């Protein structure tokens, strides 16, 4: 009987993590090799990274330079963002092209914000996603923080890689 209690204590959290993690950005398929040690944050490495990513057959490229891969498509035609004043709930992880994580949501809860209150690359991508989608975004500098960068976390003129899971859309009145 005691052994069963021990097994229950060991396996219950594992099952919980597996089930609860299904909507998290970290739970998306591995993206090893997308960003990492092969790239530094120099301008030349940034250009090489963008070219390498664009050459992948599963990447969708938009005219303004935003690129993405659909890692998990929504099971149905879920709600989509309609305007910049809509609020979304997402799980995400943002990295530089060298693989350094600069921001991410907490695993237990998504974050929410107005679609128009984020960098242009995010706004554009969110308007294309459906609730339930998980995408990998590659956002070029001019759709991110451009020559300004963002404090010590994001140097100027950096492309950014995001893993994004859209969990909810609330329409603005």
For every predicted segment, state its role:
Residues 2-173:
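Cross-family detector of peptidyl-prolyl cis-trans isomerase
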């Amino acid at each position: 009987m005691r052994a069963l209690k021990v097994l229950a204590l060991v396996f219950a959290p594992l099952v919980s993590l597996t089930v609860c993690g299904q909507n998290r950005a970290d739970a998306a398929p591995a993206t090893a090799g997308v960003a990492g040690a092969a790239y530094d944050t120099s301008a030349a490495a940034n250009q090489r990274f963008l070219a390498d990513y664009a050459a992948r057959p599963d990447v969708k490229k938009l005219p303004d330079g935003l690129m993405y891969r659909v890692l998990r498509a929504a099971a149905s035609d879920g709600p989509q963002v309609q305007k910049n004043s809509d609020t979304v709930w997402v799980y995400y992880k943002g990295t530089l092209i060298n693989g350094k994580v600069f921001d991410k949501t907490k695993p237990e809860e998504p974050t929410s914000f107005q679609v128009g209150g984020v960098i242009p690359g995010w706004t554009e991508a969110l308007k294309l996603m459906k609730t339930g989608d998980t995408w990998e975004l590659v956002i070029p500098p001019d759709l991110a923080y451009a020559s300004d960068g963002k404090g010590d976390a994001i140097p100027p003129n950096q492309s950014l890689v995001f893993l994004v899971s859209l969990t909810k859309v609330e329409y603005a009145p």
